[in-house]
Swiss-Prot record:
This is PTS system lactose-specific EIIA component. The gene is lacF. Gene3D superfamilies: Phosphotransferase system, lactose/cellobiose-type IIA subunit. The phosphoenolpyruvate-dependent sugar phosphotransferase system (sugar PTS), a major carbohydrate active transport system, catalyzes the phosphorylation of incoming sugar substrates concomitantly with their translocation across the cell membrane. The enzyme II LacEF PTS system is involved in lactose transport. Mg(2+) binds at D81.
Length: 105
């Protein structure tokens, strides 16, 4: 994997994580408005985006674990940051939606 490929992989992770983040924030807004079916659906969609980002990341990690030297890329680090914070956001949003559901009862 050369530097350009690593940079493109970083952008791919940023894109998937960004899509997931947008869906999660939209899910929270839906829950605030009492539309729990939409909120749950958006969380599932976000999970699919996160899975795609994670798959891209896992491929890179497997290559490094097999001994391949991988070039450093600030874009990849940015992608890793986005993915990590989006995974955390998904956990927090899940709990917030559950609280909204309890409050609606």
């Amino acid at each position: 994997m050369n530097r350009e490929e690593m940079t493109l992989l970083g952008f791919e992770i940023v894109a998937y994580a960004g899509d997931a983040r947008s869906k999660l924030l939209e899910a929270l807004k839906a829950a605030e408005n009492g539309d729990f079916a939409k909120a749950d659906s958006l969380v599932v969609e976000a999970g699919s985006c996160i899975a795609e980002a994670h798959s891209s990341q896992t491929g890179m990690l497997a290559r490094e674990a097999s001994g391949e030297e991988l070039p450093y890329s600030v874009t990849m680090m940015h992608g890793q940051d986005h993915l990590m914070t989006t995974i955390l956001l998904k956990d927090v949003i899940h709990h917030l939606i559950e609280l909204y559901k309890r409050g609606a009862k």
